[in-house]
Regions:
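Solvent-exposed loop and beta-edge segments used for protein-protein assembly and interaction
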Residues: 9, 16-18, 29, 82, ...
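Short, surface-exposed beta-strand/loop "edge" segments at domain boundaries and coil↔beta transitions
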Residues: 40-50, 93-102, 124-127, 138-139, ...
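Extended, loop-rich substrate-binding clefts of extracytoplasmic carbohydrate-active enzymes
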Residues: 59-122
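Intrinsically disordered, low-complexity, charge-dense segments enriched in Lys/Arg
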Residues: 142-157
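Acidic/polar low-complexity flexible segments
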Residues: 137-144, 172-175
């Protein structure tokens, strides 16, 4: 793992990960990392851009449109002593909720990137998920969480590839107009 980045936030270089024709690039914006996923195919670039800040549904900074990530590290994943692929891990905070993220090439699709997100909740969420802008609309990914217990950890995962965004392990994907 690379050492913690001690540079001032305004001088943090982009962090990227790729899988085939898909690349995710994280850039520092204000007080958090934001990202864009691009698919280069057939001479065109299709992109998904994270929507950051308050979610339009909740309009409350405690419930951001996408997980707030304030620290990122690029790591090399290992499994059972064998060398694995690259990964980006991140952590962050919004209100009383703590986020963690793992971003890796999807182990089941050669041309996709998998996002696995966890949020530790201490109060009932108004909104919880990930949101992307694409082609004038919004794509929202939410967890299948049927619990009301607090505190609790909610996990959602999704994969982004040439075919679009797909929920993994019960996550649901919906599309709305912006």
């Amino acid at each position: 793992m690379e050492p913690h980045d001690t540079r001032p936030p305004t001088s943090r270089p982009p962090v990227a990960i790729a899988a085939g024709s898909i690349a995710a690039t994280f850039t520092w914006a204000g007080d958090r990392w934001v990202h864009r996923i691009a698919h280069q195919g057939a001479g065109e670039t299709v992109g998904w851009t994270s929507l950051d800040g308050p979610c339009p549904i909740a309009n409350d900074p405690r419930w951001p449109a996408s997980p707030v990530l304030v620290e990122l590290s690029r790591v090399g994943a290992t499994r059972a002593g064998a060398s694995g692929g690259p990964a980006i891990v991140g952590v962050g905070l919004a209100g009383r909720s703590h986020f963690s993220a793992s971003i890796t090439p999807d182990p089941h699709a050669s041309d996709a990137i998998r996002f696995e997100i966890a949020c530790r909740l201490h109060e009932a969420p108004v909104w919880l998920g990930s949101t992307y802008r694409v082609d004038g609309g919004l794509i929202q990914i939410t967890a299948a969480d049927g619990s009301d217990a607090l505190p609790r950890t909610v996990v959602w995962a999704y994969s982004i590839g040439p075919q679009g965004i797909f929920g993994v392990r019960g996550a649901s994907v919906s599309t709305t107009t912006a």
